[in-house]
Amino acid sequence: MKSLLKGINQVIPVTGEKWAALSEAYAKCIAEHLTPETRWLDAGTGSRLLEEDLDALENWLVQRSGMTVGMDIRVTQHLNIRSLVGGSVYDLPFADRTFDLVTCNVVMEHLGQPEKALAEVARVLVRGGALIVNTPNLWNYGVLANAIFSKILPEQWRLGLVRATDSREPEDIFPVRYRANTLRRLHSLLRANGLKVHRATVLPQPRPYFRKTAQVEKLLMTLTPGVRLLVCAHKET
């Protein structure tokens, strides 16, 4: 594994820039599981694989996989994936044991029934197949604030705050639930569905959200945990 990681790090087209740190950490985790034989499902795919504009990195990942399928409630076009399927994570439109790898990038936080979605992921994974989850950490100050705002503010007001710090199009921003967004909760849900965690990392927040409050946020960044949970689990049976 060490030699594989060394090889990946030598060729993977990462920038090493702070603004890209979260996406590049996630991409490296994916790369460790890709071979020319890999059958990969990106569940909740949206219009691209990564959050930042990292076209070369996204193309590199897809080219390393034998088969890549993108699935979402509504998908009309995708930057990198040509095979697109409409469907719900609660009822994946695939046969049992279809995929070697399933990825969920900033998806879990939107699910009202994460346990149901993970049961479906486990169903379509082969034995020994991997699930990689990249999702916000509820205990980070910014994520926790968003969770609180989602409870007390009208959704349109909350979306306005999100858009102030996010480059996504309005149609790509969805309501949040945060029902699987602590390491303890995510571990529990994965274990309950026969998925054993092999790696769990809390990724640090690259920078403050707002320029005007940067000094206060830098203090909060030292007092609260990192912003992102990056978890890799494998199907045991």
For each feature predicted by the language model, list its residue ranges.
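S-adenosyl-L-methionine-dependent methyltransferase catalytic module, highlighting the catalytic core
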Residues: 115-120, 130-236
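Class I SAM-dependent methyltransferase Rossmann-like catalytic core
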Residues: 1-33
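Short secondary-structure boundary/capping segments within folded domains
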Residues: 30-33, 60, 220-223
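A short alpha-helix capping/helix-coil boundary motif
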Residues: 7-9, 99-100, 164-167
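Soluble or luminal CAZymes and related metallo-dependent hydrolases
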Residues: 18-26, 53, 113, 178-182, ...
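Conserved SAM-binding loop
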Residues: 33, 38-143, 230-235
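Short histidine/acidic/glycine/proline-rich micro-motifs that form metal-
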Residues: 16-17, 46-49, 176
